[in-house]
Structure formats: structure tokens, C-alpha cells
Amino acid sequence: MDNLINNYVSFISENKTERLCTKNSIRIAQEYGYRDINSVDKLKAGDKVYYDKMGKSMILFNIGSDDISKGMNILGAHIDSPRLDAKQNPIYEDKLYKTGIVYLNTHYYGGIKKYQWVASPLAIYGVVVKADGTKVDIAIGDDPEDPVFCISDILPHIAQEQMKKPASDFIEGEKLDAVLACYPNVKNYKNPEEGKYEPGDGKKNVLKYLEEKYGITEDDFASAELELVPAGKARFIGFDKTLVLGYGQDDRVCAYTSLIAMVEGAAGARTNCCILADKEEIGSNGATGMNSHLLDNAVAEVVARLDVKGNPELAVRRALANSYMLSSDVNSAFDPLNAGLYDIYNSSFLGRGVVFNKYTGARGKSGASDANPEFIAKVRGKLYESEVYFQNAELSKVDTGGGGTIAHYAAEFGMNVLDCGVSVLSMHAPWEITSAFDIEQAYKCYKAFLLLA
């Protein structure tokens, strides 16, 4: 399993956006014989295809020998993570105080503690699409030769008023702007005769640099998707190196293990399916999220290429309604430093295997998909047979908070769904903690589940 863990650490280090996750998941799938469904006219048992949605989410299918109307075994994870997104007009210079500092103006994405994102090195990833359709990929901050970016904070010596505010307010979302550059007053201290920078020159110089290096202009940011993420690679924690520290482990720890379980699995009686979805952190809305027709459209494309008897629309509906799904998403690990937030009898712990969440939601299970015990028993039986370690848990104590996954969107099709993922400490922080043992068990769990009859 060492290769699995090392490959996982590399994957989350190199794929910090949903676009990169999709691009490299497709590459991995192709290495295992998966083809773009748009390149295939007919499908039969044993065929392996993927459905790419706008380069930001994807679904893989391994066609089984049974009629697809009998249902599929589905693994469903998400590949987006909390971050800071650049605004549409993102670059500005401090002209009021004439400091020469140039900033990237951002809007946070997903549920974050804003104070965790200041005074730390950040990288910029994304794509800029020019008016002629040319795409320019941006990746700055993780190469050793790259600069990084940073959001400044107030020194504690003068932060008395700031520190009186609640944690949700003492760093304002509107002030989560990263320093891009700082131009001094004098252009050349060794030769003052070269003149001084005037207000606005700093922004002009940044834009000039971007045009020379990337061929993009300020207007091109209107059609850009740029993300500020933590700079640096994932690392092992502790003397025993049993824990992994990395950005975006919610939910790429489940996405990667689901992907590898899927591509390594052989075709069985039931068709296997693996969803790597976007937009979960903001409610799964949008064309690349699960709160769209992402899944049923993909299944319809598969059914259209199969020799299905009868009404194809009914075949799609039956295929979905008769499916089994693991919503592969993470759960909050018990934190002994904050034990009062957890029901210790119903918590998940690092290093004890994958986690079953029968339900998620908030308060009175609002927004939950409550799994059926008959289905849970079926999954349990398979995991016992495959010697997979698992535990049962909730997110926290009742009324302490809550959360959701993509489970209820899949359940709308009438299928059986169970949340099953990896425990995470410091969830939604720039750097999250998982257990290498749990990652191994997730892989084993997902591989076993795909064999469910």
C-alpha cells in the first residue's frame, strides 16, 4: 500500500483545482484503457469509458454483463475544495496611500475560517480564456523558482480592537486580498535620476509582466477562472509518518481512492460507475455539480450506446433507481483538544478505517439522505468479507452544527445511497490531516463495493 499513499500525496500536491483533478484523472483512466464516450458509437460488456463535463467534473463507466437497467455500483466523490477565487476585475493598486502595493482582489469559495488564510504562502492556479478562445493555463507558486503570494495581517502589538471581534469577523472577507507586487517610490535607488513611480505604475507593471509572460491583457480577466490555494506540497506528519498533511483532502482523499479502485477493478455483472463532481462546497449548483443533470445525462449517453431493449428513457430511470451508491465524502475526525463538540460514542477516529455516516444534515437531519438499514447491511457484509476496517459516526454532537454531501442529489433518483469516507482533522483549513491507514482502507472499501452483486 506504500505506493498508493505516495501516489496519493503526489496527486493532491499536483492537482489543487477541479480542472487539474479532472485533467489528470482522465490521464490515469486512459492509462487503464478508458476512452472518451464521445469517441465511441457502441458499448458492450467490458468496455470502459469516461464522460468529461466541461473539464471540471467527470464520470467513469465500466460496463457490466447485466442489463444496465438492473442498476449500477456507483462511487461518488467531489474534487472542488475551499479556496479564494479571483474576482472578475481582480488587480488593483493602493492609490489612496501611495504604497505601491498591488493586490489580487478575491472572493472566498466554500465554508472557510477566513483568519486561516492570512500570513501564509499562496499559489495561483487556473485558466484565462482570451477573446479568440485561446486558453492560457496559469500555475504560479509551487515551482521552487516561483514567487508566492500572501494576505497581510495586523501585528499583535496594535491588534487590540481586532482581537475583541468574534473569529468570524476579525478578518473580513473583503480584505482577503493577496499581495501581487510592491513597487518602491524610486525606480532605481542607485540612480535616482531615473525618476519615481507614480500612483498606478505598479498595476501597469504587473499587467505588462502578465502580457509579456502569458500574452494576457486586463480585459482577459473577464473570462478567467483563477484560484488562490495554499502553496507547498503535501507532507507526512509525525515521527512515524502515519498521517498526511495536505490541501484539499476534503474530498480529494475520497476522489483519488475512488478513482484508483475504479480503474483497477475488472468488469463484473453490474456496471461500475465513478463520479468526480465539482461545486459540492457551494451546494453542488451549476452545470458541473451534482445538483444538475450531470449523472442522468451521462447515464443516458451510455444507454444510447448499449443494445437496450424497450424504452431507453425508462432504461435510464431504472438504471439509476436500481443502483447502489457510496457517497465518498469525508467526516470530521474526533479532536481530543476540542472534545466537547463531539459525541464520543458516535464519532470517527483517525486510524480506525472508513466512516459510515447513515445520515448527515443539520439540526433535525435537515438536508440529509438517511440510508436504509437493508443497504447498510449489504455493504457491511461485503466489507467484512473483504476484511475492511470501518466505523460508524456522525459529524458532531446534535445541534452543534451540520453538513451535507452529494448523497441526497443521487438519492433523488430513488437509489440506495450511503455516505462513506475518510476522517479528517482540521477540515476546510488550508492544510488538512488524514490517516494513511484510513486512506488504504478507503481504497479497499471502494474496490470491494464495486463487486457488490
Regions found by a protein language model. Name each.
Residues M1-A453:
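N-terminal hydrophobic/helix-forming segments and targeting peptides
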